[in-house]
Every structure is written in structure tokens, then in C-alpha cells.
Amino acid sequence: MRTNKKDLLLATALSIVESDGLAALTYDSLSAASGISKSGLIYHFPTRHQLLVELNTSAARTWTRELEAAAGGPASKVSLRQRMHALLEVESHSATRADLLLSIDANLNEEIRAIWDQALAPWTDPHNPHAVVVQLIADGLWVYDHINARPLTQQQRQAAVKTAHIFLNKLSTTPSKPSPTSDFTNNIK
């Protein structure tokens, strides 16, 4: 399959964010790294904001593909247990710097936050306390090494995943959608 120029530019942009941070992603840096003129970049991304929207959209698609591969299908076709297991599997490894920076920045912009909410919401159930605990463990594993002086050892990661499986085993194996009427506080046991 032939990769189009826009996809190559997004991959280059992601590598800039990974190595130098989000603030370093400019038309100048992307032009220098890709060999494409600034006017060529503006053709694909008329504004830096549009570049960030496209970069987050691409990252969210990648994330969704990883979740679907781990779950064995799209969120709408698998059980809550499979969805949460996939989330745990995908997030049990430390985030890349680029993913973490995009995630943090997304919360500062409603349009970009909506991209991630649309991608991730089908995979979680904020009304199921066991699913919330699994998500908290998965999210914690994903960011831990970036916010603590000492990274987790492989044994510590495995212990956290094992603990999450206790809560995973309490989730239904029947394909289901989140129930907005569930009472979070009364369901944790």
C-alpha cells in the first residue's frame, strides 16, 4: 500500500513531538525534517491548529486499531470484558513521549478532546466500577514512567496487570454497551 504525502508528514510531525516536544512542532521544523516547503505544508495543513487536529486524528485511529486488534473486533462487537482487557493490554506499556504530550494537550482544546473522546469512549464504561478500576490501572501504567523518578520494573507492571485481572473477571463476557443508568458508587464490591 502506498503511503500518501500527508501520512508521511504526520509521521514526521509525530517524530518531532517525540524527540523535541509539542512546542517544537512548527512549520519550520516540519519543513526541515520532511524536506517539504512551508507552502507545501500549508497546502496540507492551513494552520498549526489543523496540523494538531490531523495529528491527533491519526493517533486516535492508530489507538483504535490497536484496541480492536487486542479485543478481537470493534468495540461495538465485543464484551465489556474484552474491551477493558484490550485497554489494559494496550496501555500496560509506558506511553511514548509523543502520545503523552498529545494526550495532555488534547485536554486544552475542545475540538481535539472530542477526537479522543469519540475514539476511546466506546471502549470504557464510566458507570461500571470494575471497568473504572481497570481503566485507572491501565492509565496509571501508561503514564507512570513519565511522572515518577523511578520507572516501574517489569515485575511491578505484571503485578498491576494481575491485579487488574481480578476486576476484569468481574465484568460481563456478553457484548454490551455502557449503561448510563448504572450507579457507580453502589456497584463496587
Q: Where are the model-predicted features located?
A:
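Hydrophobic alpha-helical connector segments
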Residues: E54, R61-R97
